[in-house]
């Protein structure tokens, strides 16, 4: 009891009871530097910088939030206009790292590499305006052999012209494979060989119902 009274009469608070490390304020331009290899996998995945190579973590890049900046062009979701701007440091490092590999890769793989590196999970995939934007860049589909596109990816709430699969563009309804219709009740239950386009001969024994 005497100990508690002496501690209560002290004019100061013991440092052991105070929180010494405070988190960064929400509306602040202070940048935190953490050592990458010590991060847990989940934190390292969540705090990966925006303009970085796929599978790498950028270090020492300024990432403006756009909340306290007077110039909105410096925000993290906008691309700077000047290529020599210091805010493009990580992008220039990414482009220099993958420029040699892009020349040796097919165009489809280069397209996929840029998609995954520039993907912004904060912005949704569909928009209510015809101009599709992927991240902060205007996106235009290019026909790449072997890659499937959604025909109404830039049309929010627009139904396709036919009631069939809408993930293979420019393919008429009769030419569609039997398993691509949206209504599973319309799928054929007979086995079908896509390579020969033949169906098995009807068996003589009736099938039980």
From Swiss-Prot:
Its annotated compartments are: Cytoplasm, Cytoskeleton, Cilium axoneme; Cytoplasm, Cytoskeleton, Flagellum axoneme
Superkingdom: Eukaryota
Q: Which Pfam families match?
A: TKTI1 (PF15041)
Q: Which GO terms describe its biological process?
A: flagellated sperm motility
GO terms under cellular component? axonemal A tubule inner sheath; axonemal microtubule; sperm flagellum
Say what the protein does: Microtubule inner protein (MIP) part of the dynein-decorated doublet microtubules (DMTs) in cilia axoneme, which is required for motile cilia beating. Located at the center of the tektin bundle where may function to recruit tektins or stabilize the bundle.
- Listed PANTHER family: HYPOTHETICAL PROTEIN LOC690617, TEKTIN BUNDLE-INTERACTING PROTEIN 1
Q: What is this protein called?
A: Tektin bundle-interacting protein 1
Q: What is the lineage of its organism?
A: Eukaryota, Metazoa, Chordata, Craniata, Vertebrata
Gene responsible for this protein: TEKTIP1
């Amino acid at each position: 009891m005497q100990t508690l009274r002496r501690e209560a009469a002290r004019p100061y608070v013991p440092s052991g009871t105070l929180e010494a490390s405070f988190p960064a304020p929400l509306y602040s331009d202070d940048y935190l530097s953490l050592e990458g290899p010590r991060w847990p996998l989940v934190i390292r995945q969540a705090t990966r910088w925006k303009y970085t190579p796929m599978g790498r973590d950028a270090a020492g890049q300024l990432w403006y939030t756009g909340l306290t900046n007077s110039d909105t062009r410096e925000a993290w979701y906008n691309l700077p206009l000047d290529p020599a701007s210091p805010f493009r440091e990580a992008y220039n490092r990414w482009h220099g790292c993958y420029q040699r590999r892009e020349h040796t890769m097919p165009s489809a793989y280069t397209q996929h590499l840029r998609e995954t590196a520039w993907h912004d999970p904060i912005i949704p995939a569909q928009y209510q305006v015809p101009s599709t934007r992927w991240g902060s860049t205007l996106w235009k589909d290019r026909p790449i052999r072997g890659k499937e596109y959604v025909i109404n990816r830039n049309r929010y709430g627009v139904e396709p012209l036919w009631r069939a699969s809408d993930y293979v563009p420019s393919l008429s309804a009769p030419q569609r494979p039997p398993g691509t219709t949206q209504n599973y009740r319309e799928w054929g239950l007979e086995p079908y060989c896509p390579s020969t386009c033949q169906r098995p001969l009807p068996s003589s024994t009736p099938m039980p119902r």
